[in-house]
Amino acid sequence: MENQVLTPHVYWAQRHRELYLRVELSDVQNPAISITENVLHFKAQGHGAKGDNVYEFHLEFLDLVKPEPVYKLTQRQVNITVQKKVSQWWERLTKQEKRPLFLAPDFDRWLDESDAEMELRAKEEERLNKLRLESEGSPETLTNLRKGYLFMYNLVQFLGFSWIFVNLTVRFCILGKESFYDTFHTVADMMYFCQMLAVVETINAAIGVTTSPVLPSLIQLLGRNFILFIIFGTMEEMQNKAVVFFVFYLWSAIEIFRYSFYMLTCIDMDWKVLTWLRYTLWIPLYPLGCLAEAVSVIQSIPIFNETGRFSFTLPYPVKIKVRFSFFLQIYLIMIFLGLYINFRHLYKQRRRRYGQKKKKIH
């Protein structure tokens, strides 16, 4: 009887320059890992889903990679890192469109790249570019333009959110609770400007100007702009509610520390107090901000029901009226789902930035 080829479970993730594969095999012995003709070959003795056996698999990559994989054995798995030949984002891992049954995305790894790692990587890239340009005798025009552009972008955002934060603070100190009810008419124009400009941040990540992951930036951009432009912007009845003050105040409180931190990073400055604030203040502010957004959605539901705005009727023969409030109720669930995902991501950022007790690997 011919022996059946056993394949282990493999999880993958990527960055612009690297591919990461996690092979679910424990107590691995005699691993044979190589890349020939752009195909990754893996064969090893280990304990997997089918017990202690020899497992193997082959993956033909979507695009060209460097033929020197780097792997690390742990007690529970094999971690493989493969360098892409061209720094770019792949739409899938393999050349064949149909994903192999043993292959799945490593969702934790897709969201784990922290700001601290990105800073170190950016600095290392900058150092290597500087050495290369010096050896070639070329000016650092592109590097300086990129740093100057990012510095100015973060400076403008910092000034915009600082104006909102200071304005709301001063008005509250002078007028007290009365300042809550005209917050929108006082600072909405500046908030519109800052949030429209935030689109650039997501574009920068998508095209590789920055090494930030696209997904967290996109989630925050879409969530905030939905609250600002749909909930507040289209409903005059919502614009004089106190919740607008709390949403705008919490957003600006978070961003003045985030953008000032990024701004100083562009000029290679590290102010430890600011760094600590950037990686700590989100712990109370981020959940409070999500809670304020949820309150604004809840308060808007009866208004949308009453006005019928954005509601529509399905065509014949169904002819069912679909209220916009139905989508708002779904959005409420998405707010708290996003809170969980981003809170977990931000916690890992902070833990990696300030270190953790290292677990002993046998």
UniProtKB/Swiss-Prot annotation:
The chain crosses the membrane at residues 150-170, 186-207, 218-235, 242-256, 280-298, 323-343. One of its GO terms (cellular component) is focal adhesion. The keyword Lipid biosynthesis applies. The active site is at Y286, E293. Residues 5-94 form the CS domain. Pathway: Lipid metabolism; fatty acid biosynthesis. Residues 1-149, 208-217, 257-279, 344-362 are cytoplasmic. Its main location: endoplasmic reticulum. Highly expressed in testis, kidney, brain, liver and weakly in skeletal muscle, spleen and heart. No expression detected in leukocytes. PROSITE patterns: CS (PS51203). It is found in: Endoplasmic reticulum membrane. The modification Phosphoserine is found at S114, S135. Induction: By AKAP12 and histone deacetylase inhibitors such as sodium butyrate. The modification N-acetylmethionine is found at M1. The modification Phosphothreonine is found at T7. It is a multi-pass membrane protein. Keywords: Acetylation, Coiled coil, Endoplasmic reticulum, Fatty acid biosynthesis, Fatty acid metabolism, Lipid biosynthesis, Lipid metabolism, Lyase, Membrane, Phosphoprotein, Transmembrane, Transmembrane helix. GO terms for molecular function: 3-hydroxyacyl-CoA dehydratase activity; enzyme binding; GTPase activator activity; very-long-chain (3R)-3-hydroxyacyl-CoA dehydratase activity. Gene3D superfamilies: 2.60.40.790. Its EC number is 4.2.1.134. It catalyses: a very-long-chain (3R)-3-hydroxyacyl-CoA = a very-long-chain (2E)-enoyl-CoA + H2O; (3R)-hydroxyhexadecanoyl-CoA = (2E)-hexadecenoyl-CoA + H2O. May interact with enzymes of the ELO family (including ELOVL1); with those enzymes that mediate condensation, the first of the four steps of the reaction cycle responsible for fatty acids elongation, may be part of a larger fatty acids elongase complex. Interacts with RAC1. Associates with internalized insulin receptor/INSR complexes on Golgi/endosomal membranes; HACD3/PTPLAD1 together with ATIC and PRKAA2/AMPK2 is proposed to be part of a signaling network regulating INSR autophosphorylation and endocytosis. Catalyzes the third of the four reactions of the long-chain fatty acids elongation cycle. This endoplasmic reticulum-bound enzymatic process, allows the addition of two carbons to the chain of long- and very long-chain fatty acids/VLCFAs per cycle. This enzyme catalyzes the dehydration of the 3-hydroxyacyl-CoA intermediate into trans-2,3-enoyl-CoA, within each cycle of fatty acid elongation. Thereby, it participates in the production of VLCFAs of different chain lengths that are involved in multiple biological processes as precursors of membrane lipids and lipid mediators. Belongs to the very long-chain fatty acids dehydratase HACD family. This is Very-long-chain (3R)-3-hydroxyacyl-CoA dehydratase 3. It comes from Homo sapiens (Human).
